[in-house]
Amino acid sequence: MNSAGYEVFEVLSGQSFRCAEGQSVLRAMEAQGKRCIPVGCRGGGCGLCRVRVLSGAYRSGRMSRGHVPAKAAAEALALACQVFPQTDLTIEYFRHVGGNKPDNMNYEEVTS
């Protein structure tokens, strides 16, 4: 257990913030006034806060398989509202392209 929390770095925005033990990446970002990931339902259902974890260990909460299919989760895609760091993390915000079909695995990096 790390009482000081973990550093989370979002590569596209260049922003970083601290995430307390047991706190989701999205809640930590909001609490510190950062805006590198869009905020939606905060409960794993809308898919708006989709990220790819580039490095670090984390625990995932419940996420809609309509937004993060098992194959995508295996490729380190997750919803920031359901990502709970266990080490420092490097993440990248991603947007889904082509609708919300679980079998549609087209993702694109958002650079704007």
Curated annotation (Swiss-Prot):
Pfam families: Fer2
Keyword Aminoacyl-tRNA synthetase in record: no
Protein name: Ferredoxin, plant-type
SUPFAM superfamilies cross-referenced by the UniProt entry: 2Fe-2S ferredoxin-like
Molecular function, one GO term: 2 iron, 2 sulfur cluster binding
Signal peptide location: none
Gene3D superfamilies: 3.10.20.30
Biological processes, Gene Ontology terms: catechol-containing compound catabolic process
InterPro entries hit by this protein: 2Fe-2S_ferredoxin-like_sf, 2Fe-2S_ferredoxin-type, 2Fe2S_fd_BS, Beta-grasp_dom_sf
UniProt lineage: Bacteria, Pseudomonadati, Pseudomonadota, Gammaproteobacteria, Pseudomonadales
UniProtKB keywords: 2Fe-2S, Aromatic hydrocarbons catabolism, Electron transport, Iron, Iron-sulfur, Metal-binding, Plasmid, Transport
Domain of life: Bacteria
Summary of the function given for this chain in its UniProt record: Ferredoxins are iron-sulfur proteins that transfer electrons in a wide variety of metabolic reactions.
Pathway info: Aromatic compound metabolism; catechol degradation
Annotated ranges, domain 2Fe-2S ferredoxin-type: 6-97
Family: Belongs to the 2Fe2S plant-type ferredoxin family.
Binding-site residues, [2Fe-2S] cluster: 41, 46, 49, 81
